[in-house]
Amino acid sequence: MTSSTSVAMTTYPASFASDPLIARVAANLALVRARIATSAAAPERVRVVAVTKTFGLEEVLAAAAVGLGDVGENYVDELESKRARISSTTLRWHYLGALQTNKIARICKCADVIGGVSRVRELERIAACHTEAVIYLQVDFTGANGRNGASPSTIDELAARARSLELNLRGLMCVAAPGEQAAREAFSATTRLADALGLEERSMGMTEDLEIACELGSTEVRVGRALFGPRVSPSTLA
């Protein structure tokens, strides 16, 4: 679900001005789209996922009101709760966090897109749920302990297993280490891997590095603070 609206064409109903949150999200979305427009070769192909983790239902509804069709959560409890309380059939819900095998069945029931997949056993658990969710494999180039994601050397094996299980594998997801050079290296390598595997989606880029990601081939950016402002929790992963 990509947006074809350029920043120059972005207009919203006058009634938005009466809701301060929607007005603020609309203004911030215009800024995000402007950043994409200055860096992506094909800005219309870059999907914006509104990362609503730790935010309330109001932010999810504001994102939908300004035309965003994709929202992302990192915690299964939040994903379940918000999806159950919002009746929209047009929103596409992304699970973006690390996967715990004992929670995969719950995730499969409420996620339309499952990112962060980095192990064969996770793929097998997802397949056992008979879900049609879109799957992204997460790749990590740092090798650091505690970071989610598979080593680049194992991505071929994971992709082959996902396909053998007949999962809806569509792309790769990457969270770059801090710093421009690290981001450039990670995003370039992710694009090369996706191309080699014949995967059309590259979920790369967040609030602080989306320009670099778009320049290097991202088809999806995941932004929270750029749309909604500071989080109420100390997490800064989006």
Label every model-predicted segment:
Residues T2, V7-E201, M206-E208, C214-L216, ...:
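Conserved alpha/beta-domain cores
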Residues P234-A238:
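Active-site loop ensemble at the mouth of alpha/beta enzyme cores that anchors a bound cofactor
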